[in-house]
């Protein structure tokens, strides 16, 4: 699949070719030089459960080389060492979930309230670079610096 992406006054083309069973997430992120670039994150799910939810962290922030995602108020390490330009995903029980992302031991953004996770559904946390240091999104919805 080929796509043309326009962000502000910049336009670029991106080709996406998926392998069978592969999921690809495409994001536009700041390139550090005042422009934008397209990034593809690929994952091949190892399992699916209709009784559990799936949650992932996508780390697009090179200034946060090892993000951690915890349950808000706890240091339980839902995800540890989520390296830049990588994705981690895992199955979790369908419970009410509020998570906090941290970079280098410091909270990044505000806690993300997913509400009740639904069985069989996929949820994502995005860690993005900004001039303020980092932006955290859940499923594409901005939640703070």
List the model feature ranges, each with a label.
Residues 1-145:
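Intrinsically disordered, low-complexity polar regions and short flexible loop motifs
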């Amino acid at each position: 699949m080929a796509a043309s992406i326009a962000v502000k006054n910049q336009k670029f083309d991106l080709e996406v070719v998926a392998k069978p069973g592969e999921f690809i997430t495409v994001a536009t992120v700041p390139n550090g030089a005042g422009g934008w670039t397209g990034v593809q994150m690929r994952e091949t799910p190892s399992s699916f459960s209709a009784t559990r939810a799936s949650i992932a962290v996508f780390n697009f922030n090179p200034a946060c080389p090892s993000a951690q995602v915890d349950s808000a108020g706890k240091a339980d390490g839902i995800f540890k060492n989520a390296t830049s330009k990588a994705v981690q995903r895992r199955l979790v029980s369908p419970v009410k979930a509020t998570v906090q992302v941290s970079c280098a031991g410091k909270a990044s953004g505000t806690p993300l309230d997913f509400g009740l996770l639904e069985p069989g559904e996929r949820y994502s946390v995005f860690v993005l670079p900004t001039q303020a240091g980092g932006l955290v999104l859940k499923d594409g919805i901005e939640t703070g610096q």
